[in-house]
Amino acid sequence: TMRIFGNGMQLLVPGALGAKVNVKALVEMQSPPFAARNVVALLPGSDPTLASQYVAIGAHSDHVGTARRGLDHDSVFVFNRIVRPAGAENDDKMGNAEQFAQINAELAERRKNGPGRRDSIFNGADDDGSGSMAVLEMAEYFATQKVKPKRSLLFVWHAGEEKGLWGSAHFTEHPPVPRDSIVAQLNLDMVGRGSATDQTGMSADGKELRGGPDYLQLVGSRRLSTELGDLVERVNTGKKHNFSFDYAMDANGHPMNIYCRSDHYEYAKWNIPVTFFTTGGHSAYHQLTDEPQYIDYPHMQRVTRLVADIAAELGNRANRPAVDGKKMDPRGSCKQ
């Protein structure tokens, strides 16, 4: 105190200025560990023999956290819709003069309804609140049926998907049932959008993909089991769900490598047949604007009913889907 202010502590007054000093300090930052848990529900099968086999249905319960500072919701929404239609999948583009004129005009129109709302929370309504709720709805539905599927159903809400498939990796490394007793895994990740105005992805040759009223992307359904892929198609038409399946993101060598980027992969690498259901990307992907008011709930309901019928078919058929595709090395790397 004497060196900086020239007086002892007892003589200091508020606002006093002292001399400049140089300080060397070593600061060590440590993040405290937090436990993250998968949530697993089991519905026992009704057949004494087949009940020891399992159909796994999953989603992920995490998202990407918070922003360092609050941003204006309308500004983020309009900017991404015009400049970054694939959200975080796009490069950090800044836009051009024509786009900014369009942004300013749309913001001015929105401001007529009141001031903007600042937000710093990535809610993840579609990614993957939609899939998580779809799995919960299926669990409740099957639990209320008088006649349960012959095989048991495993409902799994994976933690840490956004950190690198942590929860699904842990689940398949330490499964609560014998790993080879899981006959298939159905993964729902982002099933709440898919409109004609959404850029849902890119084809392998760089063409934009767009959604529509009956839109649904499938990834991986025939990579390990042709039989599973055929079953998914048969249920879609036979049960009159009438989705138009888009397989463009499942192309071999696709640069987005989506087959390796969601929880189904951690099952597939152990040669468990999988299907990844998604309505695809959009301008709110990993953005503050991924909020519930933008979910297409009737479309999400249709996806949920489709997957429930597929799970029931897998649960009741005589044989498990045969693995006839190229088997994977669970310790190897993933390349679509």
Whereabouts are the PLM-identified features?
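Soluble metallo-hydrolase cores and metallopeptidase-like ectodomains found primarily
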Residues: 1-124, 137-140, 144-147
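Solvent-exposed loop/turn segments at secondary-structure junctions
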Residues: 30-33, 47-48, 61-65, 160-164, ...
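Phosphate-handling active-site elements
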Residues: 140-153, 178-180
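Metal-dependent peptidase/peptidase-like ectodomains
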Residues: 1-3, 158-276
